[in-house]
């Protein structure tokens, strides 16, 4: 294994540890006498948006840009290059969205108002899932990490579509049109072999603003920009995509992701009782994440492989896939976002119950997913 790849994994592992520490600190503060200060900080307005908004829709767009760059590189010259391998995470993601939603609906069939939260357990929190995986360092095969990246991003893109169609009542048509135009310009630049990153960043910023104003989750702009950055530069030039990926990684690992965890993991447990935890809404969310996710992802993956529709990534077996499918039950921030859309305005009590379910399901998925990965992975990197 080259020194570059070794350093990459060391960096990511350290960033993953910092991410978990930041989340733990947020939980402690949110349930202490410092909770009002924490809340005030997150709701302080800067330039027309709260600090929380800037982190979730601004800085996280940079994280999604990095994800887009990594997935594109793997699609063009890495583990997802072949059609059979590329289709595998897409099929798994479909199962990972359907099964959790069905579990939630089964628990809340008798409550029409609660049913509006059906999409809450359908999401996978890429940041936290990668953070847990990164704790295992270079024991994780590159192909397994890429599978998780691709699966999670397809999953979250699917959730963004769900949000746009089912949870957005005030879409701005003008902003969406501008966003589509900017997307077209980005891929026009790519087709014309423009290799200067500054032009992509300029158009990408306008795309981000338009998506933010459209009512659609602004992080989608980061994904689109990532896929537009060219892999190959002009003759004699370094790869624009690899250069940007290398430049962004330390800022994302040690800055954006820990800050993101700190801003979103602070859920107050004040007033929580055993009775409230065992009602159908939090149970539907928790079991949708902890049971529905692995059930959907693993079953769809198994059928896809056995039928010959897709093939396993190199160096990966079905035990690894099952462990990752459990890890994908970490819905956390995206699930919280959907909960706020489904219940936040109309029913704050339902929103709190859903968040409790998200906390339970995501914690179980993180702990069990880590244990399963620890058991199934080789003790040392090959």
UniProtKB/Swiss-Prot annotation:
Main location: membrane
Bilayer disposition of the protein: Multi-pass membrane protein
Keywords: Antiport, Cell inner membrane, Cell membrane, Ion transport, Membrane, Sodium, Sodium transport, Transmembrane, Transmembrane helix, Transport
Transmembrane segments: 14-34, 49-69, 87-107, 117-137, 146-166, 171-191, 205-225, 247-267, 285-305, 321-341, 356-376
This protein's record includes keyword NADP: no
One annotated GO molecular function: sodium:proton antiporter activity
InterPro entries: Na/H_antiporter_dom_sf, NhaA
Keyword Ion transport set for record: yes
Domain of life of the source: Bacteria
GO cellular component terms listed in the entry, alphabetical order: plasma membrane
Gene3D superfamilies xref list: Na+/H+ antiporter like domain
Catalysed reaction equations from the record: Na(+)(in) + 2 H(+)(out) = Na(+)(out) + 2 H(+)(in)
Cell location: Cell inner membrane
One family name in Pfam for this protein: Na_H_antiport_1
Annotated GO biological process: regulation of pH
Disulfide bonds: none
Family assignment from sequence similarity: Belongs to the NhaA Na(+)/H(+) (TC 2.A.33) antiporter family.
Functional note: Na(+)/H(+) antiporter that extrudes sodium in exchange for external protons.
Protein name, per record: Na(+)/H(+) antiporter NhaA
The organism of origin for this protein: Aliivibrio salmonicida (strain LFI1238) (Vibrio salmonicida (strain LFI1238))
Recorded name of the encoding gene: nhaA
